[in-house]
Amino acid sequence: MFSRTASKFRNTRRLLSTISSQIPGTRTSKLPNGLTIATEYIPNTSSATVGIFVDAGSRAENVKNNGTAHFLEHLAFKGTQNRSQQGIELEIENIGSHLNAYTSRENTVYYAKSLQEDIPKAVDILSDILTKSVLDNSAIERERDVIIRESEEVDKMYDEVVFDHLHEITYKDQPLGRTILGPIKNIKSITRTDLKDYITKNYKGDRMVLAGAGAVDHEKLVQYAQKYFGHVPKSESPVPLGSPRGPLPVFCRGERFIKENTLPTTHIAIALEGVSWSAPDYFVALATQAIVGNWDRAIGTGTNSPSPLAVAASQNGSLANSYMSFSTSYADSGLWGMYIVTDSNEHNVQLIVNEILKEWKRIKSGKISDAEVNRAKAQLKAALLLSLDGSTAIVEDIGRQVVTTGKRLSPEEVFEQVDKITKDDIIMWANYRLQNKPVSMVALGNTSTVPNVSYIEEKLNQ
């Protein structure tokens, strides 16, 4: 499988060069209120996606109003000063557009996909739902029940639960440690005043990016932005996009064992401090993650895999159900590590943790081959191309990059960064990030045999 992947994308630079010659790249402009417009024109298409990215998510909340950004997302389509809920739905259907939104720890995003001639209408609607929502009390109460049910569903998703707890202990008493939905007590108590205060504080022009991709004319989108978003106020003390807005997050050593002995599996997340979106070693972190890789028993690969960890997992079929290496980045911090699902017995849990630590130590010791490094780089480039499939995916990439780093690297620029990575870079990165550094860990399920953080640190540092 890996050789086929490497072969398939051996000529990615030639392919990317062809694509780049046809696409003019990302253009940016800025309104007087600080709002950034960023676009990428895609030839030979008649549709486009436009999205408004706000540099504010659950990270912009406090303990008392945690969950407000997500609550606002639910209310965005429930009526504005200019349109009723039915009116919004009818208008979207009449132009055949698709409207959606999501909230993350750092961003609030609303986007619409439409035909080229309907871009002005799409921008108008995005502005309306973002800046002029009515926030009707009856709608608030209805959505409160919906969000409570959503929270209950999330609690059944073990990976979500584990990673929420991982953030909470790793960023203890810090904004990044808060969940996106917020605690149930907040969901039950958030008021219209809380919602309006969040908008007033965070919805500022200099904290917004209007991104467009597809059959979109940059100059025209700038005009639409001025018409529909020009009224958005500017921050009293604007901070450039990609610059810190507060104290840098502190990575905290810690562990949490959530005992659920009735579960047939144990879920474990082990993390060390990773890298931010704009860190110089961002792509090295991803390449190191790719070398560690992922494995799933259900897929049945591994015995012929070039990954020693995958081979160990597959040769002992009960060692783990699956594992997934991760490199999660934020504007000024990150988490790098492994998520494991295994049967709840002492033998399996101890073995899989030891095998993972063995793999990390192998990378630190330099016992990786040039072939592994080249394979990891090929996988990164392949993943990039596959992730930019369609105007919506490109808008997501543009918006995320500009909001978090202040600029957008083109795919070709990313390829250049990845191609520069050497085996020595990865070894140096692993020795800096994985040696004598604090570890955080969360385990869910039958946790009685899960090694603690002290054990992991001791083994990793040997």
Curated annotation (Swiss-Prot):
InterPro entries: Metalloenz_LuxS/M16, MPP/UQCRC_Complex, Pept_M16_N, Pept_M16_Zn_BS, Peptidase_M16_C
GO CC annotation: mitochondrial matrix; mitochondrial processing peptidase complex; mitochondrion
SUPFAM superfamilies per the UniProt record, alphabetical: LuxS/MPP-like metallohydrolase
Localization: Mitochondrion matrix
Note: Present with 1360 molecules/cell in log phase SD medium.
Phenotype when the gene is knocked out: Simultaneous disruption of the mitochondrial presequence protease CYM1 results in synthetic lethality in respiratory conditions.
Residues annotated as transit peptide in the record: 1-20
Effect of E89A: Loss of catalytic activity and loss of binding to MAS2
Cofactors that this protein relies on: Zn(2+)
Keywords (A to Z) from UniProt: Hydrolase, Metal-binding, Metalloprotease, Mitochondrion, Phosphoprotein, Protease, Transit peptide, Zinc
Catalytic activity: Release of N-terminal transit peptides from precursor proteins imported into the mitochondrion, typically with Arg in position P2
Ways its activity is controlled: Binding to MAS2 is required for catalytic activity. Inhibited by high levels (> 1uM) of zinc. Inhibited by metal chelators ethylenediaminetetraacetic acid (EDTA) and O-phenanthroline.
Organism: Saccharomyces cerevisiae (strain ATCC 204508 / S288c)
EC identifiers of the protein: 3.4.24.64
Effect of Y198A: No effect on catalytic activity
Pfam families per the UniProt record, alphabetical: Peptidase_M16, Peptidase_M16_C
Alphabetized PROSITE patterns for the sequence: INSULINASE
The name this protein goes by in its record: Mitochondrial-processing peptidase subunit beta
UniProt GO MF annotations: metal ion binding; metalloendopeptidase activity
